């Protein structure tokens, strides 16, 4: 120990020396930094204090060595200069690091803080002093200034003192160094002490003096040498030699032989419990299953070598008790190992000794494990059900009692409970059989009880008890079965279940459902008897009491019989409760009844239920139950009536309750007739079914009673009785007399009526069925594709019709008798009125109408007749009763019209779905025919009218299809903007049954339906007729049957002349006084208002729409479009005349002033225009035009004549091309701007331009389908920025230029196209392409150069060059920056849909089926998808809005839609043709009959605003 301490003491003088040296350094530093002279205090004599009033705080202090460095150097030099001779200049103290010294703050920051504080105080003072204006405020202002000045002076005096203190502050730095040095030394001492303690506790813990080696010391002292090395050194550094694997194998083999030899000698003493002995690798493993396993070996070959115990493994396990760990702790196992090894060393038979020792230990351990498991069960899951009666570890006995009965005895203390176990199980070790292990004994004994499996190693008391419970439960159930059979011999008791056995008892003889079976089982945990009936409640009193009675030891046969009777009654009551759940009754408690009603129940049995009828709350059904020997349970039903303060029982008939055909009643309404000889099947129905039917019967009788009383109030005779045996069902309310409610004689109807009754159906819901049975029905179905209703075996020509059942269900959930009576009367009135008209019609039908129509259906409340050539038109007749009083004027017939598939297609395999859409035109006049039928009740006349007029009306109805005609160009020409520039092209409506009017603009045609298959058509346009050549139109179709009626019928005056429109314009308003002679009037184009008589075939041909050259039209449509176009063309030409007054922003400024109107008639317009020749616009050369209605083709044509000698290119072929282009492109287009462009093109005559234009038109019209280049002249231009239309061909008169737009594409249907826009210089005869594309400009230069060389006109040369390059793929310009056509639909209005089906615009109540949409050719009036653009490729981009509105005015769709009165499109139409100052033509008739916007002519000096500007869209 002294040698370890010496170094510590050796270092002490050095530390003392260092300490003395440190003290001398401190003294020298203090002497070095002493001041040379004392410093006088501050003049103020006050000490420096830094507080919050000066604006400085400790949080704002920062280190500032930079700003104090200069002052520190000056002070140090001054101090050292005075004492340099005595002390050295170098400071012996260490330097203080930056973060270890005191905190500092820069002086400039401190000054900034002070200045900012003063500035803030001045600002606050200035704001406060402005508010003090009175004398008192003046005094306060002075005081504030004094206080501010004093505080500011004091603050800056402190700063001055601080600055003076900085000169001597350097002397304080030595204190900081001393403090830092002391802290550093203190930390050294602390670290040294910590290190010494760590060395003492760690490294020096084992440092001790070694033992003295005597032998080496003697050798050293005597011999002087050291010859022996200690074995510790050898063992530490020289490892022992390892044996080889072969040697190891030999050793283990030898050990195995020795062990086998030793064990063979001890084999007679080895216990038989050791089931397995394994010898391997020199080890012997002995295994006792379920107890232990040991490993032993021999460490020598001699006989005296003892057995060595290597390992013990206890196989007794319980993971729940040990929580996953072995039951024996390793320390305990080591102790066992040592004790057993010592016992084996002294034992004569070590193997037997080891077995006896470990077997005894394992048996004790197994018993302890079972005790712990039982304790857990007794405290947990099987609490109060098992008990540990005895546990003795020494005797090794464990007694467990189960199925404990708890009872109280008078001998016990209050609160104590006596626990008696019904059964016991004893687990013990037999002293006479030590090798047998634990054994089990049961009290009382029974076969197949639970056993312990000791060989498994994991004993379980739970498994033992579970196996025991199963046997005990079966024992108890068998005993209960014997008791039940002895008490009730007729009771059928069955044992069911294997793992969970139970007894099943059928309480009632007819019990078949498991829910009604009683199940008796035993609770395996406590041994109690459990009874359960699924259909009854689990807490049912009788069920629980019966289970307790069976569990008790005192259960007599009488007690069992009593409980079984109670349970049977309870089961029947529950059956009845469930059977009436779906019926309109509810169970009420006796406490809910009134006191006087309870008195009536005094004598009734206690087992009863009371049912209250929901619809008749004054009636109660009392059902009582009582046990009976024969019927098991006897049921008695009584009806209790509670009215006011009186209650009484009503006697029920026995046949209502017991004599009902329940099976037949279930099949009610299915038309199944039971055999008459078959007896009632009541026996096959259960008791509750009969009760349910009885409840329903009573409910029906109560309902019929109320209903019969209400019918008798109305004067209707009734009889409540049952039907005959072949009619299924119960009661029925038969109606016997209705004479008092029928307003007319109806004897024929009642002769046909066999039975009229009302039945109640309450199977699914509470509904009534009004049932009537008829015979000799007037009309039956006789369509060709169907079969009439006739009996088998009867002749087909029998005149009397078959009897039929008419059973109709009234889907009403109301139980009001008044409502039912009203519905019954309404149904009777409907049948009577329908029969009245149908019976009259049936007489004529058999003689005449069966050749022209067929009966689709007659059901007494509805008649459906198909008529027409194909029997595809339907007339649907019904009668509606609106009023309460029968025969009121409010009642009316429903007369609707519809369609069906033609009869010839019903049996055909192929159906043409692409045929023309059809609709029933009679739907236009359905309201008129309905009113007429209401007045006359004559269905014969109605059907005669329908059959006679269907053919012409189908043809005329083609004009009722909704088609819109664009008015955008026209509205721009006349000035005012129209929000919706479209109008209906045609409007067809009916004035009466025989008069129709077709309106197109201000042209109105009246069509009269005459007898003898004749039609009369006349012009009834307002103020004067306007249809020139109307007679010629029909005469061209059929001259033999067309004639003019001699008697001219006056045109009816307007119903409201003030709103009919302004006076019609006259042609003189648009013509100047000219000296030209007028042409002679063609007599074929005469105008007349006399009716034109024709046949049905003629009008059908005139209205037959066909596809002609890509346009769907008919002769009458072509004629009316021509008349309308002439009127619009006249207004267009007037805008091109010098008299036109144009707007500043009008797009027609470049197209006016060169047209003069010569003459205008309803059938032609003559005008002239100045030519554009090489000298510019020359007024002396004219082009003469005549647009006229051809009397042969009855379509518009044009005649163009140039003055003689003014146009050499006006050859016959070129003029024919120009006129053909007008007929095929300009007129079908129907656009006013297109007409302006056409006139501009035809009046261009400079340098044979007519030839070039004719070539262009020929290329457009004669484009072959196989050509890769399609060229089209653009006639209309749409400005995408202003949304305005304009002529695409314009003339700039001052510059003498004309603008051309040519569309080039691959085909007419191609969506991609290019626009060639160029300017033709009229005087210079060359073209200019205003494009940034250099190729286009180069191409124009080439054409101009060629024209100069060869002469001619460059227009056609340029277009031809473009075509050639387009075919070769060299030209594909991208000049589509301003497309020719774009959207023109107003953005603030949504355009309506295309075409609605006829049902959308037909009269109310129409049943015409929905027709498909418009089949018009899609496209705008000037777009490429229009009818004419598809043929001639005029334009490419469609106009905005739906395609249905992008229509050519002359294009006609397939018939099938209706533009009838009441259509919402009537507000969007532009009525009439166009006159000056208005969009709608003067004198035009608005479509429809009522509800159209009024129009008053403007007074002089007032501007006109079209009424459409003020119409709300969409209309409300």
Curated annotation (Swiss-Prot):
Please verify whether the record's keywords include Transcription: yes
Biased composition, class Gly residues, residue ranges: 1474-1483
Q: Does the keyword Nucleus apply?
A: yes
Keywords, sorted A to Z = Activator, Nucleus, Transcription, Transcription regulation
Q: Where is the composition biased (Low complexity)?
A: 34-47, 1463-1473, 1502-1516
Q: Biological process GO terms, please? A: regulation of transcription by RNA polymerase II
Q: Which domain of life is it from?
A: Eukaryota
Gene Ontology MF terms? transcription coregulator activity
Compositional bias, Basic and acidic residues, is annotated for: 72-83
Q: Name one GO cellular component term.
A: core mediator complex
Against InterPro entries, the record matches this protein to:
Med14_N (IPR055122), Med14_RM2 (IPR055113), Mediator_Med14 (IPR013947), RM3_Med14 (IPR056879)
Which residue stretches belong to region Disordered?
A: 22-98, 1434-1516
Q: According to its UniProt entry, what is the function of this protein?
A: Component of the Mediator complex, a coactivator involved in the regulated transcription of nearly all RNA polymerase II-dependent genes. Mediator functions as a bridge to convey information from gene-specific regulatory proteins to the basal RNA polymerase II transcription machinery. Mediator is recruited to promoters by direct interactions with regulatory proteins and serves as a scaffold for the assembly of a functional preinitiation complex with RNA polymerase II and the general transcription factors.
According to UniProt, the name of this protein is Mediator of RNA polymerase II transcription subunit 14
Gene name for this UniProt entry = rgr-1
């Amino acid at each position: 120990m002294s040698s370890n301490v010496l170094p510590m003491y050796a270092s002490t003088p050095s530390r003392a020396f260092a300490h003395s040296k440190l003290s001398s350094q401190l003294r020298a530093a203090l002497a070095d930094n002493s001041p040379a002279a004392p410093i006088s205090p501050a003049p103020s004599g006050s000490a420096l204090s830094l507080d919050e009033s000066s604006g400085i705080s400790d949080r704002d202090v920062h280190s500032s060595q930079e700003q104090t460095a200069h002052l520190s150097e000056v002070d140090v030099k001054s101090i050292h200069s005075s004492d340099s001779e005595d002390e050295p200049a170098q400071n012996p103290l260490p330097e203080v690091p930056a973060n270890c010294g005191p905190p500092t703050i820069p002086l400039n920051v401190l000054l900034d803080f002070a200045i900012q504080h003063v500035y803030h105080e001045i600002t606050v003072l200035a704001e406060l002093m402005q508010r003090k204006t009175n004398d008192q405020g003046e005094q306060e202002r002075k005081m504030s200034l004094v206080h501010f000045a004093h505080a500011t002076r004091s603050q800056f005096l402190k700063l001055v003192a601080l600055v003076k203190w900085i000169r001597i502050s350097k002397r304080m730095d030595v204190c900081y160094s001393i403090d830092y040095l002391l802290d550093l030394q203190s930390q050294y001492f602390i670290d040294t002490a910590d290190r010494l303690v760590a060395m003492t506790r760690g490294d020096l813990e084992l440092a001790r003096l070694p033992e003295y080696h005597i032998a080496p010391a003697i050798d050293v002292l005597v011999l002087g040498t050291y010859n022996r090395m200690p074995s510790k050194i050898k063992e530490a550094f020289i490892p022992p030699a390892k044996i080889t694997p072969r040697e190891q194998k030999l050793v283990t083999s030898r050990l195995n032989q020795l062990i086998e030899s030793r064990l063979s000698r001890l084999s007679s003493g080895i216990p038989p419990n050791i089931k397995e002995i394994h010898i391997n690798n020199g080890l012997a493993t002995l295994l006792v299953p379920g107890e232990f396993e040991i490993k032993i070996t021999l460490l020598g070959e001699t006989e005296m070598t003892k057995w060595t115990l290597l390992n013990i493994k206890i196989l007794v396990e319980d993971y729940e008790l040990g929580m996953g760990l072995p039951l024996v702790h390793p320390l305990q196992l080591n102790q066992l190992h040592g004790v057993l090894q010592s016992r084996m060393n002294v034992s004569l038979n070590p193997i037997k000794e080891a077995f006896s020792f470990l077997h005894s230990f394992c048996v004790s351990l197994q018993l302890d494990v079972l005790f712990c498991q039982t304790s857990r069960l007794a405290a947990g899951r099987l609490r109060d059900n098992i008990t540990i009666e005895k546990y003795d570890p020494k005797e090794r006995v464990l007694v467990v009692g189960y199925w404990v009965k708890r009872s109280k005895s008078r001998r016990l203390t209050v609160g104590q409970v006596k626990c008696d176990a019904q059964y016991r199980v004893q687990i013990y070790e037999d002293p006479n059989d030590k090798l047998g292990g634990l054994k089990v004994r049961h009290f009382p004994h029974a076969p197949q009880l639970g056993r312990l499996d000791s060989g498994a190693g994991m004993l379980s008391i739970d498994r033992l008890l579970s196996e025991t419970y199963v046997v005990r439960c079966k024992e108890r159930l068998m005993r209960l079965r014997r008791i039940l059979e002895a008490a009730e011999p007729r009771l059928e008791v069955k044992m069911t279940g294997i793992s969970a056995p139970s007894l099943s008892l059928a309480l009632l003889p007819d019990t078949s459902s498991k829910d009604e079976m009683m199940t008796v089982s035993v609770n395996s945990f406590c041994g109690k008897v459990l009874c359960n009936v699924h259909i009854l409640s689990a807490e049912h009193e009788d069920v629980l009491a019966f289970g307790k009675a069976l569990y008790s030891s005192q259960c007599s046969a009488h007690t069992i019989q009593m409980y079984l009777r109670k349970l049977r009654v309870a089961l029947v009551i529950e059956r009845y409760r469930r059977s009436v759940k779906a019926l309109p009754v509810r169970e009420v408690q006796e406490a809910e009844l009134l006191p006087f009603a309870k008195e009536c129940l005094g004598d009734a049995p206690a087992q009863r239920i009371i049912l209250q009828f929901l619809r008749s709350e004054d009636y109660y059904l009392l059902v009582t139950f009582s046990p009976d020997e024969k019927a098991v349970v006897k049921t008695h039903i009584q009806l209790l009536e509670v009215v006011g303060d009186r209650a009484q029982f009503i006697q029920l008939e026995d046949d209502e309750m017991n004599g009902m055909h329940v099976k037949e009643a279930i099949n009610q309404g299915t038309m199944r007739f039971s055999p008459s000889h078959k007896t009632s099947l009541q026996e096959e129905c259960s008791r509750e079914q009969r009760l349910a039917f009885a409840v329903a019967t009573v409910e029906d009788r109560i309902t019929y009673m109320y209903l019969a009383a209400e019918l008798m109030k109305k004067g209707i005779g009734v009889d409540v009785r049952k039907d005959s045996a072949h009619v299924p069902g119960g009661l029925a309310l038969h109606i016997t007399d209705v004479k008092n409610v029928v307003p007319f004689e109806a004897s024929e109807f009642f002769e046909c009526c066999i039975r009229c009754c009302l039945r109640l159906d309450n199977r699914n819901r509470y509904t009534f069925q009004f049932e009537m049975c008829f015979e000799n029905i007037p009309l039956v179905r006789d369509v060709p594709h169907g079969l009439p209703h006739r009996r088998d075996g009867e002749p087909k020509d029998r005149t009397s019709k078959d009897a039929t059942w008419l059973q109709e269900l009234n889907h009403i959930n109301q139980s009001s008798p008044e409502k039912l009576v009203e519905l019954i009367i309404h149904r009777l009135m409907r049948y009577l009125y329908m029969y009245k008209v149908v019976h009259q019609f049936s007489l004529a039908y058999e003689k005449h109408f069966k050749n022209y129509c067929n009966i689709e259906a007659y059901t007494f409340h509805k008649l459906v007749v198909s008529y027409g050539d194909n029997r595809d038109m339907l007339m649907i007749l019904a009668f509606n009763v609106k009023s309460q009083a029968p025969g009121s004027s409010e009642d009316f017939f429903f007369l609707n019209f519809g369609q069906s598939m033609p009869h010839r297609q019903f049996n055909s395999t192929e159906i043409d779905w692409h045929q023309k859409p059809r609709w029933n035109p009679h739907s236009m006049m359905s309201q008129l025919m309905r009113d007429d039928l209401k007045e006359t009740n004559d269905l014969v006349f109605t059907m005669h009218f329908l059959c006679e007029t269907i053919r012409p009306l189908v043809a005329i109805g083609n004009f009722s299809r909704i088609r819109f005609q664009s008015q955008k160009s026209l509205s721009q020409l006349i000035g005012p903007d129209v929000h919706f520039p479209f109008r209906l092209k045609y409007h067809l409506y009916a004035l009466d049954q025989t008069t129709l009017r077709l309106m197109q603009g201000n042209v109105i045609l009246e069509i009269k339906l005459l007898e003898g298959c004749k039609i009369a058509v006349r012009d009834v346009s307002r103020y004067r007729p306007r249809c020139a050549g109307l007679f010629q139109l029909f005469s061209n179709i059929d001259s033999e049957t067309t004639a003019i009626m001699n008697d001219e019928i006056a045109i009816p005056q307007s119903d409201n002349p003030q709103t009919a429109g302004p006076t019609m314009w006259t042609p003189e308003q648009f013509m100047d006084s000219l000296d030209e002679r007028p042409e002679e009037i063609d007599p074929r184009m005469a105008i007349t208002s006399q009716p034109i008589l024709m046949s049905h075939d003629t009008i059908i041909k005139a209205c037959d729409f066909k596809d002609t050259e890509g346009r769907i039209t008919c002769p009458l449509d072509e004629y009316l479009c021509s008349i309308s176009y002439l009127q619009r063309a006249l207004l267009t030409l007037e805008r091109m005349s010098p008299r036109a007054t144009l707007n500043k922003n009008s797009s027609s400024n470049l197209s006016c002033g060169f047209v003069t109107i010569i003459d205008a008639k309803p059938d032609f317009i003559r005008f002239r225009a100045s030519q554009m020749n090489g000298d510019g616009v020359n007024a002396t050369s004219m082009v003469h035009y005549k647009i006229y209605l051809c009397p042969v083709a009855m379509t518009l044509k044009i005649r163009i004549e140039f003055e003689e000698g003014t146009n050499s290119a006006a050859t016959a072929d070129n003029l024919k091309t120009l006129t053909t282009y007008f007929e095929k492109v300009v007129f079908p287009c129907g656009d006013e701007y297109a007409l302006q462009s056409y006139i501009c093109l035809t009046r261009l005559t400079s340098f044979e331009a007519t030839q070039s234009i004719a070539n262009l038109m020929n290329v457009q019209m004669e484009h072959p389908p196989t050509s890769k280049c399609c060229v089209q002249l653009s006639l209309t231009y749409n400005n995408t920025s202003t949304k305005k239309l304009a002529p695409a061909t314009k003339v700039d008169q001052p510059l003498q230029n004309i603008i051309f737009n040519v569309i080039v594409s691959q085909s007419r249907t191609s969506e991609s196209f290019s626009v060639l826009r160029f300017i033709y210089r009229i005087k210079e005869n060359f073209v200019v392409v205003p494009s940034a594309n250099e190729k286009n400009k180069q191409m124009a230069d080439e054409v101009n150069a060629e024209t100069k060389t060869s002469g001619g006109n460059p227009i056609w040369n340029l277009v031809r060059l473009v075509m050639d390059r387009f075919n070769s793929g060299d030209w594909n310009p991208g000049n589509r920056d301003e497309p020719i056509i774009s959207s023109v639909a107003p953005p603030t209005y949504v355009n309506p849909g295309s075409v609605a089906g006829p049902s959308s615009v037909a009269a109310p109540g129409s049943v015409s089926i929905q027709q498909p949409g418009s089949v018009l050719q899609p496209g705008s009036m000037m777009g490429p998808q229009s009818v004419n653009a598809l043929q001639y490729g005029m334009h490419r981009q469609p106009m905005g809005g739906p395609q249905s509105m992008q229509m050519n005015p002359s294009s006609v769709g397939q018939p099938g839609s209706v533009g009838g009165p009441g259509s919402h499109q009537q507000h969007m139409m532009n009525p009439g043709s166009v006159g000056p100052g208005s969009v709608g033509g003067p004198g035009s008739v608005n479509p429809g009959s009522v509800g159209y916007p009024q129009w008053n002519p403007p007074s002089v000096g007032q501007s006109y605003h079209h009424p459409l500007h003020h119409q709300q869209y969409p209309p409300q």
